[in-house]
Amino acid sequence: FNAKKQLLEFLSEDIGRGDITSQLLPKRNISARIITRQIATVAGSRYAKEIFELKGCSVKILKKDGSKVKPNDTIMVISGDAKKILSCERTALNLLTRMSGIATQTDQLVKKISNKKTKLYSTRKTAPGLRYFDKEAVEIGGGGKHRLRLDEMVMIKDNHIAVGGSLLSLIKKAKKKYKKFEVEVENTVDAVLAAKEGATIIMLDNFSPVLIKKTIQVLKNQKLRHRVILEA
């Protein structure tokens, strides 16, 4: 992942051929601050800093990623040509606020999980271009990463089964090539099948809390629960 390349693309997307409004202003050096409006967990400060620096500005970070902030705290101070600061402020703020929002919500959710063995993970359901930033924000908030890319681990889902014929046949193929693989199931019967056949991880897709509890008990009764990691 080339963060600098991605940040330059973000800037190009917003600035286009130039910030024609800021070009109306006289040349003037200024100092600007990014101030918080609410209680939050900071994430993305280093990327916001890099965005400003790519335009030739100087940045001093006062609240690093992972910092807990309250209203009116200063996250960073930016110094430099006013035109340059104004041309990239929105790109920097958008990424900083997005990542901080994700980190803040993740932190709140993690604190609600009473069972310390239970972990909160992010999925691949992210907007193109933002995956690495979103997943890093989840980690800063106390969560973990699921797959970043399709080449990291086999994950057999409903559409694969629809094309491939059956869950069992795909599991057997996966077992021949990979030590670790995940299976998404839609019912308890398939969860048991996946566990018996050696799935490392089983995703209980759209299971209600009641059905999750029932499935866990069935796996325990058949002495299969210890074999697998469950996701829901």
Task: Outline where the language-model segments fall.
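Short acidic, S/G/P-rich loop/turn micro-motifs used as interaction or catalytic elements
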Residues: 209
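Acidic/glycine-rich phosphate/pyrophosphate-binding loops and surrounding catalytic core
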Residues: 1-197, 201, 213-214, 218, ...
